[in-house]
C-alpha cells in the first residue's frame, strides 16, 4: 500500500462536540495473506495493522459495538465507552454485513452473515452465524 498502517480503524465520535472519543485499529493480519504473497516472506504474524473493511457496526442499548467487517474472519464486541475489545469469535469466513440482534424466550442473540468472497484469497462460502449473549443475572 501507498499509506502507512493502520489500514482500518474503529472510531467513536461525539457528534455534539465534534470530537473523537477513542479510536483503535480494526483487524489483524494473521491468516489473511494469500499463499503466493506469504510464501516468499517471513512476516512476524500477527500484524496489528488493521485490514480492509466491508460492512459496519451494530450498537446495542447496553453499550456494546459489534462488528465483523474485517478480512480476518472475526466478529468482535467492543465497549462503546472506551473502545476496549471485550470479545471476539472466529467465523467460517469474513463477515461483510452489519450484524443484527434478536431475542427469543428472553435470550438475546447476535447474528451475522459471512461470505461473499470480498477478497480474492478468502474462503468462499455464505453462512449465517448466531451467538447467544450471556443470560442476564436473576
List where the protein language model places each region:
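A fold-level detector for beta-propeller and closely related beta-sheet-rich head/sensor domains
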Residues: 1-138
